[in-house]
Amino acid sequence: MRIIDSGIISRSVPGTDRATLTFPAVLCKADGTLIATWHSGLTKDCADEVIEVSRSSDFGRTWSTPGRPFESPALHGVRGSVKIVYLTERSPGRLMAAAMWIDRETYPDAPGLFNPETEGCVPMYILLADSEDSGETWSSWREVPMPEVIGPASLTNPVMQLPDGTLVMTIESNKHYLDTSRWYQRVVAFHSTDGGRTWGEPAIIGFDPTGRIFNWDLRSAVSPDGRIGAFAWTYNTETESYLNIHRRVSSDGGRTWSDPEDIGVTDQAAHPAVLPDGRVVLPWVDRFQDQSIKARVAPSIDGTFDPESEVTLYAHEAPADDPKGALGFSVWSFGLPYSEALSDGSVMVVYYAGTETAMDVHWTRLAP
Protein backbone atom coordinates (compact mmCIF):
# COMPACT_ATOMS: atom_id res chain seq x y z
CA MET A 1 0.00 0.00 0.00
CA ARG A 2 1.24 3.51 -0.77
CA ILE A 3 0.20 7.12 -0.30
CA ILE A 4 -0.98 8.77 -3.52
CA ASP A 5 -1.43 12.30 -2.24
CA SER A 6 -2.64 14.27 0.76
CA GLY A 7 -3.86 17.69 1.83
CA ILE A 8 -6.14 19.67 4.11
CA ILE A 9 -9.92 19.80 3.70
CA SER A 10 -10.44 22.73 6.05
CA ARG A 11 -8.16 24.89 8.18
CA SER A 12 -9.07 26.06 11.66
CA VAL A 13 -9.32 29.67 12.80
CA PRO A 14 -7.87 29.93 16.33
CA GLY A 15 -9.94 31.76 18.91
CA THR A 16 -13.21 31.35 16.98
CA ASP A 17 -16.00 28.78 16.70
CA ARG A 18 -13.80 27.17 14.01
CA ALA A 19 -10.76 26.73 16.25
CA THR A 20 -11.09 22.95 16.54
CA LEU A 21 -12.23 20.98 13.50
CA THR A 22 -12.49 17.39 14.67
CA PHE A 23 -14.33 14.05 14.34
CA PRO A 24 -14.30 13.98 10.50
CA ALA A 25 -16.06 11.41 8.34
CA VAL A 26 -16.40 11.04 4.58
CA LEU A 27 -18.91 9.41 2.23
CA CYS A 28 -18.23 8.45 -1.39
CA LYS A 29 -21.54 8.68 -3.24
CA ALA A 30 -22.52 6.43 -6.13
CA ASP A 31 -21.53 9.17 -8.60
CA GLY A 32 -18.03 9.44 -7.08
CA THR A 33 -18.64 12.71 -5.25
CA LEU A 34 -17.18 12.91 -1.75
CA ILE A 35 -19.04 14.51 1.16
CA ALA A 36 -17.05 15.18 4.32
CA THR A 37 -18.54 16.12 7.69
CA TRP A 38 -16.83 17.29 10.88
CA HIS A 39 -17.33 19.04 14.20
CA SER A 40 -16.49 22.74 14.41
CA GLY A 41 -16.19 24.62 17.70
CA LEU A 42 -14.02 26.68 20.01
CA THR A 43 -12.93 23.43 21.69
CA LYS A 44 -13.44 19.71 21.04
CA ASP A 45 -16.43 19.71 23.38
CA CYS A 46 -18.38 22.96 23.57
CA ALA A 47 -21.97 24.16 23.55
CA ASP A 48 -21.40 26.24 20.41
CA GLU A 49 -20.33 23.26 18.29
CA VAL A 50 -21.82 22.83 14.81
CA ILE A 51 -21.44 20.32 11.98
CA GLU A 52 -19.76 21.49 8.79
CA VAL A 53 -19.99 19.82 5.39
CA SER A 54 -17.74 20.03 2.33
CA ARG A 55 -17.73 18.30 -1.06
CA SER A 56 -15.13 17.17 -3.56
CA SER A 57 -15.61 15.98 -7.13
CA ASP A 58 -11.92 15.32 -7.89
CA PHE A 59 -11.01 12.58 -5.39
CA GLY A 60 -10.22 15.06 -2.65
CA ARG A 61 -7.79 17.35 -4.40
CA THR A 62 -10.12 20.32 -3.95
CA TRP A 63 -13.03 20.89 -1.56
CA SER A 64 -15.98 23.26 -1.49
CA THR A 65 -16.36 26.04 1.06
CA PRO A 66 -17.81 24.41 4.21
CA GLY A 67 -21.54 24.70 4.77
CA ARG A 68 -23.60 24.24 7.93
CA PRO A 69 -26.82 22.46 6.87
CA PHE A 70 -27.63 20.76 10.19
CA GLU A 71 -29.40 22.53 13.04
CA SER A 72 -29.00 21.64 16.72
CA PRO A 73 -32.58 21.27 17.95
CA ALA A 74 -33.94 21.44 21.49
CA LEU A 75 -34.98 18.01 22.77
CA HIS A 76 -37.16 17.21 25.77
CA GLY A 77 -37.37 20.91 26.54
CA VAL A 78 -33.63 21.50 26.85
CA ARG A 79 -30.97 23.07 24.67
CA GLY A 80 -28.33 20.86 23.12
CA SER A 81 -25.79 20.49 20.34
CA VAL A 82 -25.14 18.00 17.56
CA LYS A 83 -21.62 16.69 18.10
CA ILE A 84 -21.15 14.32 15.18
CA VAL A 85 -22.90 13.35 11.94
CA TYR A 86 -22.32 10.27 9.79
CA LEU A 87 -23.80 9.92 6.30
CA THR A 88 -25.07 6.80 4.52
CA GLU A 89 -26.18 6.61 0.88
CA ARG A 90 -29.13 4.21 0.77
CA SER A 91 -29.57 4.55 -3.01
CA PRO A 92 -28.13 7.02 -5.53
CA GLY A 93 -28.83 10.52 -4.22
CA ARG A 94 -30.84 9.28 -1.23
CA LEU A 95 -28.91 9.92 2.00
CA MET A 96 -29.44 9.28 5.69
CA ALA A 97 -27.70 11.34 8.37
CA ALA A 98 -27.16 9.83 11.82
CA ALA A 99 -26.23 12.23 14.61
CA MET A 100 -25.34 12.24 18.29
CA TRP A 101 -27.02 15.05 20.26
CA ILE A 102 -25.63 16.33 23.57
CA ASP A 103 -27.74 17.84 26.39
CA ARG A 104 -26.10 21.17 27.31
CA GLU A 105 -28.48 22.29 30.07
CA THR A 106 -29.24 19.53 32.57
CA TYR A 107 -25.74 19.52 34.08
CA PRO A 108 -24.40 23.03 33.34
CA ASP A 109 -21.37 22.60 35.61
CA ALA A 110 -20.25 19.35 34.00
CA PRO A 111 -16.54 19.54 33.09
CA GLY A 112 -17.24 17.57 29.92
CA LEU A 113 -19.43 14.77 28.68
CA PHE A 114 -18.38 12.46 31.51
CA ASN A 115 -18.64 12.78 35.28
CA PRO A 116 -15.11 12.11 36.61
CA GLU A 117 -16.49 10.91 39.95
CA THR A 118 -19.17 8.48 38.75
CA GLU A 119 -18.05 7.71 35.15
CA GLY A 120 -21.59 8.67 34.17
CA CYS A 121 -22.42 10.68 31.08
CA VAL A 122 -24.61 13.69 30.34
CA PRO A 123 -27.83 12.86 28.45
CA MET A 124 -27.17 11.97 24.81
CA TYR A 125 -29.63 11.01 22.08
CA ILE A 126 -29.44 9.64 18.55
CA LEU A 127 -31.10 11.57 15.72
CA LEU A 128 -31.79 10.71 12.08
CA ALA A 129 -32.57 12.86 9.05
CA ASP A 130 -33.10 12.08 5.36
CA SER A 131 -32.23 13.75 2.08
CA GLU A 132 -33.65 12.96 -1.34
CA ASP A 133 -31.32 15.34 -3.22
CA SER A 134 -27.80 14.17 -2.36
CA GLY A 135 -27.65 16.22 0.81
CA GLU A 136 -28.64 19.59 -0.61
CA THR A 137 -31.65 19.70 1.73
CA TRP A 138 -32.59 17.65 4.77
CA SER A 139 -35.70 16.58 6.64
CA SER A 140 -36.16 17.58 10.27
CA TRP A 141 -34.32 15.51 12.85
CA ARG A 142 -36.20 12.60 14.44
CA GLU A 143 -35.12 10.88 17.64
CA VAL A 144 -34.38 7.16 17.79
CA PRO A 145 -35.91 5.77 21.03
CA MET A 146 -33.46 3.80 23.15
CA PRO A 147 -34.19 1.12 25.77
CA GLU A 148 -33.29 2.03 29.35
CA VAL A 149 -30.37 -0.44 29.38
CA ILE A 150 -28.51 1.79 26.93
CA GLY A 151 -28.56 4.95 29.04
CA PRO A 152 -27.04 7.97 27.26
CA ALA A 153 -26.43 6.62 23.77
CA SER A 154 -23.11 6.99 21.98
CA LEU A 155 -22.83 6.88 18.17
CA THR A 156 -19.46 6.02 16.60
CA ASN A 157 -20.38 4.72 13.14
CA PRO A 158 -22.71 5.47 10.25
CA VAL A 159 -25.86 3.45 9.76
CA MET A 160 -25.01 0.43 7.62
CA GLN A 161 -27.23 -0.98 4.87
CA LEU A 162 -27.22 -4.72 4.22
CA PRO A 163 -27.70 -6.23 0.73
CA ASP A 164 -31.40 -6.87 1.49
CA GLY A 165 -31.97 -3.23 2.48
CA THR A 166 -32.02 -3.81 6.24
CA LEU A 167 -30.42 -0.97 8.19
CA VAL A 168 -28.02 -1.69 11.06
CA MET A 169 -27.11 0.92 13.66
CA THR A 170 -24.47 0.25 16.33
CA ILE A 171 -24.77 2.04 19.68
CA GLU A 172 -22.64 2.11 22.82
CA SER A 173 -24.14 2.32 26.29
CA ASN A 174 -23.24 4.75 29.07
CA LYS A 175 -24.23 5.27 32.71
CA HIS A 176 -26.40 8.21 33.65
CA TYR A 177 -24.46 11.21 34.92
CA LEU A 178 -25.13 10.76 38.66
CA ASP A 179 -25.20 6.94 38.67
CA THR A 180 -22.62 5.72 41.21
CA SER A 181 -23.05 2.01 40.47
CA ARG A 182 -20.43 -0.01 38.63
CA TRP A 183 -20.34 0.54 34.89
CA TYR A 184 -21.08 -2.49 32.72
CA GLN A 185 -20.45 -1.07 29.27
CA ARG A 186 -21.87 -2.73 26.17
CA VAL A 187 -22.12 -2.14 22.44
CA VAL A 188 -25.17 -3.33 20.53
CA ALA A 189 -26.75 -3.41 17.08
CA PHE A 190 -30.27 -2.25 16.22
CA HIS A 191 -32.04 -3.29 13.00
CA SER A 192 -34.66 -1.53 10.89
CA THR A 193 -36.59 -3.00 7.97
CA ASP A 194 -38.69 0.11 7.27
CA GLY A 195 -36.06 2.64 6.28
CA GLY A 196 -35.19 3.72 9.80
CA ARG A 197 -38.69 4.61 10.97
CA THR A 198 -38.67 1.90 13.65
CA TRP A 199 -35.91 -0.21 15.19
CA GLY A 200 -35.90 -3.66 16.79
CA GLU A 201 -34.45 -4.89 20.05
CA PRO A 202 -30.69 -4.54 20.59
CA ALA A 203 -28.39 -7.44 19.68
CA ILE A 204 -25.21 -7.58 21.74
CA ILE A 205 -21.94 -7.11 19.86
CA GLY A 206 -19.61 -6.74 22.83
CA PHE A 207 -20.31 -7.07 26.55
CA ASP A 208 -18.19 -8.28 29.47
CA PRO A 209 -20.52 -9.27 32.34
CA THR A 210 -17.63 -8.82 34.80
CA GLY A 211 -17.27 -5.18 33.81
CA ARG A 212 -13.54 -5.64 33.20
CA ILE A 213 -13.37 -5.08 29.43
CA PHE A 214 -14.95 -2.10 27.68
CA ASN A 215 -15.48 -2.03 23.90
CA TRP A 216 -15.33 1.62 22.90
CA ASP A 217 -15.58 3.51 19.61
CA LEU A 218 -16.75 0.54 17.55
CA ARG A 219 -16.07 1.04 13.82
CA SER A 220 -17.89 -1.27 11.43
CA ALA A 221 -18.51 -1.90 7.74
CA VAL A 222 -20.30 -4.36 5.46
CA SER A 223 -18.27 -6.55 3.10
CA PRO A 224 -19.42 -7.45 -0.44
CA ASP A 225 -20.56 -10.88 0.80
CA GLY A 226 -22.83 -9.28 3.42
CA ARG A 227 -20.72 -10.00 6.47
CA ILE A 228 -20.09 -7.17 8.93
CA GLY A 229 -16.71 -6.50 10.51
CA ALA A 230 -16.54 -4.49 13.75
CA PHE A 231 -13.35 -3.12 15.30
CA ALA A 232 -13.24 -2.03 18.95
CA TRP A 233 -11.01 0.30 20.96
CA THR A 234 -10.52 -2.14 23.83
CA TYR A 235 -9.94 -1.02 27.42
CA ASN A 236 -9.09 -3.06 30.53
CA THR A 237 -10.65 -1.35 33.54
CA GLU A 238 -8.61 -3.36 36.06
CA THR A 239 -5.19 -2.49 34.62
CA GLU A 240 -6.45 0.88 33.33
CA SER A 241 -4.79 0.20 29.98
CA TYR A 242 -5.75 0.12 26.32
CA LEU A 243 -5.38 -3.26 24.65
CA ASN A 244 -4.92 -4.06 20.98
CA ILE A 245 -7.82 -3.48 18.63
CA HIS A 246 -10.24 -6.43 18.64
CA ARG A 247 -12.37 -7.53 15.69
CA ARG A 248 -15.73 -9.28 15.63
CA VAL A 249 -17.45 -10.58 12.51
CA SER A 250 -21.15 -11.23 11.94
CA SER A 251 -22.46 -13.52 9.21
CA ASP A 252 -26.15 -12.94 9.93
CA GLY A 253 -26.55 -9.20 9.54
CA GLY A 254 -25.32 -8.23 12.99
CA ARG A 255 -27.61 -10.43 15.06
CA THR A 256 -24.82 -12.68 16.34
CA TRP A 257 -21.08 -12.10 16.42
CA SER A 258 -17.84 -14.05 16.58
CA ASP A 259 -15.64 -13.94 19.65
CA PRO A 260 -13.31 -10.92 19.79
CA GLU A 261 -10.01 -11.38 17.94
CA ASP A 262 -6.84 -9.39 18.63
CA ILE A 263 -5.73 -8.04 15.23
CA GLY A 264 -2.19 -7.24 16.34
CA VAL A 265 -2.20 -3.44 16.35
CA THR A 266 -2.78 -1.13 19.26
CA ASP A 267 -5.21 1.61 20.23
CA GLN A 268 -8.15 3.12 18.30
CA ALA A 269 -9.51 1.85 14.98
CA ALA A 270 -10.86 3.96 12.17
CA HIS A 271 -13.97 3.26 10.14
CA PRO A 272 -12.68 0.60 7.71
CA ALA A 273 -12.76 1.03 3.94
CA VAL A 274 -14.11 -2.04 2.11
CA LEU A 275 -13.16 -2.40 -1.55
CA PRO A 276 -15.36 -4.13 -4.17
CA ASP A 277 -13.05 -7.18 -4.19
CA GLY A 278 -13.47 -7.60 -0.43
CA ARG A 279 -10.13 -6.17 0.69
CA VAL A 280 -10.25 -4.01 3.81
CA VAL A 281 -8.09 -0.99 4.60
CA LEU A 282 -8.00 -0.19 8.32
CA PRO A 283 -6.31 2.97 9.60
CA TRP A 284 -5.80 3.42 13.32
CA VAL A 285 -4.44 6.01 15.72
CA ASP A 286 -1.67 5.07 18.14
CA ARG A 287 -1.56 7.78 20.81
CA PHE A 288 0.39 6.04 23.54
CA GLN A 289 3.35 4.40 21.78
CA ASP A 290 4.58 6.42 18.80
CA GLN A 291 1.80 9.03 18.44
CA SER A 292 0.91 8.32 14.82
CA ILE A 293 -1.84 7.39 12.40
CA LYS A 294 -1.14 4.28 10.32
CA ALA A 295 -3.01 1.90 8.02
CA ARG A 296 -2.81 -1.71 6.85
CA VAL A 297 -4.74 -3.80 4.35
CA ALA A 298 -6.34 -7.25 4.78
CA PRO A 299 -7.60 -9.55 1.99
CA SER A 300 -11.08 -9.82 3.55
CA ILE A 301 -13.23 -8.61 6.43
CA ASP A 302 -11.88 -11.47 8.57
CA GLY A 303 -8.39 -11.60 7.06
CA THR A 304 -4.99 -10.76 8.53
CA PHE A 305 -3.82 -7.17 8.30
CA ASP A 306 -0.45 -7.57 6.60
CA PRO A 307 2.36 -5.77 8.47
CA GLU A 308 4.19 -5.40 5.15
CA SER A 309 1.34 -3.25 3.85
CA GLU A 310 1.64 -0.71 6.68
CA VAL A 311 1.95 2.98 5.87
CA THR A 312 2.22 5.98 8.20
CA LEU A 313 -0.25 8.75 7.38
CA TYR A 314 0.66 11.13 10.19
CA ALA A 315 3.34 11.41 12.90
CA HIS A 316 2.62 13.72 15.82
CA GLU A 317 5.31 15.73 17.56
CA ALA A 318 4.44 16.62 21.16
CA PRO A 319 5.37 20.19 22.06
CA ALA A 320 8.36 20.74 24.34
CA ASP A 321 6.08 22.12 27.05
CA ASP A 322 4.05 18.89 27.21
CA PRO A 323 6.06 17.20 30.00
CA LYS A 324 3.92 14.08 30.17
CA GLY A 325 4.73 13.17 26.59
CA ALA A 326 2.40 10.39 25.48
CA LEU A 327 0.16 11.04 28.47
CA GLY A 328 -0.05 14.79 27.95
CA PHE A 329 -2.83 16.85 26.43
CA SER A 330 -1.19 17.03 22.99
CA VAL A 331 -1.93 13.36 22.21
CA TRP A 332 -5.61 14.29 22.01
CA SER A 333 -4.98 16.97 19.36
CA PHE A 334 -4.87 14.44 16.52
CA GLY A 335 -6.72 11.30 15.57
CA LEU A 336 -10.05 9.70 14.74
CA PRO A 337 -9.23 8.67 11.17
CA TYR A 338 -12.10 7.56 8.95
CA SER A 339 -11.56 5.68 5.68
CA GLU A 340 -13.76 5.20 2.63
CA ALA A 341 -13.30 3.31 -0.64
CA LEU A 342 -13.44 5.59 -3.69
CA SER A 343 -14.84 4.93 -7.14
CA ASP A 344 -11.39 4.73 -8.75
CA GLY A 345 -10.20 1.92 -6.47
CA SER A 346 -8.25 4.15 -4.10
CA VAL A 347 -9.06 4.81 -0.43
CA MET A 348 -9.64 8.18 1.22
CA VAL A 349 -8.66 8.67 4.86
CA VAL A 350 -9.69 11.80 6.75
CA TYR A 351 -8.50 12.75 10.23
CA TYR A 352 -7.88 15.78 12.42
CA ALA A 353 -4.52 17.10 13.61
CA GLY A 354 -2.98 20.23 15.08
CA THR A 355 -2.40 21.75 18.50
CA GLU A 356 -4.57 22.00 21.60
CA THR A 357 -5.99 25.31 20.35
CA ALA A 358 -6.14 24.77 16.57
CA MET A 359 -6.99 21.51 14.78
CA ASP A 360 -7.45 21.07 11.02
CA VAL A 361 -9.17 18.37 8.95
CA HIS A 362 -6.64 16.47 6.81
CA TRP A 363 -7.00 13.92 4.03
CA THR A 364 -4.74 11.22 2.59
CA ARG A 365 -5.48 9.05 -0.45
CA LEU A 366 -4.09 5.52 -0.52
CA ALA A 367 -3.47 2.99 -3.28
CA PRO A 368 -4.18 -0.34 -1.60
Listing of model-derived features with the role each one plays in the protein:
Residues 1-368:
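Asp-box/BNR beta-propeller blade signature and adjacent active/binding-site loops
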